[in-house]
Design a protein with these regions (language model features):
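Iron-sulfur cluster-binding electron-transfer modules in prokaryotic oxidoreductases
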Residues: 1-284
Length: 284
């Protein structure tokens, strides 16, 4: 497998360090060669495109220039970073008037981490190296609303009903539960300004997941993980309900299946303690 650049984005340096630790474990155990993109910068996330259209393209655009200089495809763990890099790619490639300061050739691929790790050959490598079964886990797969939309930008084929996470976890033995809210919005950054809105959106996700028989939720987006994990106790109090639905990154599920020994290093960062579920499933 050729070496690829990883664009970690800001959150993997802070609030989503558990995501980074689990993905680094997975890539190491699968012999996937990742090298952090040198001198990367913030993509602008939700702030830049609400303030300055040019800045919203040039911030991620600079990272694409760096990636082309490195000559390696780019893997992006963060759903929003991936979206912004794809937007920048599209805008810069059609910028014939020289509106933006950066130029790219489109010579490197930009891949969402989930897409990258759910390739058939990579999944087969996981299955070949699997140490622990996930048969007692019944997750719903929650993709969120950003990574696949708009499809004209992301190139997603099944943007309303993605299945790559479902198939990956099924190959590792998990009893994946189908549900209709795979790509519904969790409220994202509105958790600060409109917690009532986020609470209502996330409550709907909890209730449907439980009604479908799930015992956990698996995500590929840091913002989704934060809203579903960080606020679960508060949402329960707000609606007078007692929820227990551990929320995992899909990379944590892979790491568990591969028999990672330092799982406590990242699982301890969860607000909803996954230990009772993992203990009962023989995974701790």
């Amino acid at each position: 497998m050729n070496e690829v650049s990883i664009y970690p984005g800001c959150s993997l340096e802070g609030t989503a360090r558990d995501y980074r630790e689990s993905l680094e474990n997975v890539c190491r155990m699968l012999d996937v060669p990742l090298r952090e993109l040198e001198d990367w910068n913030c993509c602008g996330a939700t702030a830049a495109h609400s303030l300055d259209e040019r800045l919203a393209v040039e911030l991620p655009g600079r990272n694409l220039v760096l990636a082309e200089k490195a000559g390696r495809d780019v893997v992006v763990p963060c759903a929003l970073c991936y979206n912004r890099l794809k937007v920048a790619e599209k805008e810069l490639l059609r910028d014939v008037e020289g509106r933006y300061r950066y130029r790219i050739e489109g010579s490197v691929g930009i891949y969402d981490l989930l897409d990258f790790l759910s390739r058939p050959d990579t999944i087969q490598r996981m299955v070949d190296r699997q140490k622990v079964g996930l048969e007692d886990l019944k997750p719903v797969c929650y993709y969120g609303c950003v990574v696949n939309r708009p499809p004209k930008v992301t190139g997603a084929v099944k943007w309303e009903n993605p299945v790559n996470m479902d198939r990956l976890l099924e190959e590792l033995g998990a009893r994946v539960v189908d549900w209709p809210f795979k790509t519904d919005c969790c409220g994202a950054s509105h958790a600060m300004a409109r917690p009532d809105l986020v609470f209502a959106l996330v409550r709907k996700l909890y209730d449907r997941a439980l009604a479908q028989g799930a015992n956990c939720i698996v995500v590929s987006c840091q913002m989704c993980q934060a809203n579903l994990d960080l606020y679960q106790e508060q949402i329960g109090r707000y609606f007078h309900k007692d929820y227990y639905l551990p929320v995992f990154y899909f990379t944590e599920m892979i790491a568990l299946a591969l028999g990672a020994r330092d799982q406590q290093r990242w699982l301890k960062g969860h607000m909803v303690d996954p230990a009772p579920l993992l203990d009962s499933a023989g995974l701790m």
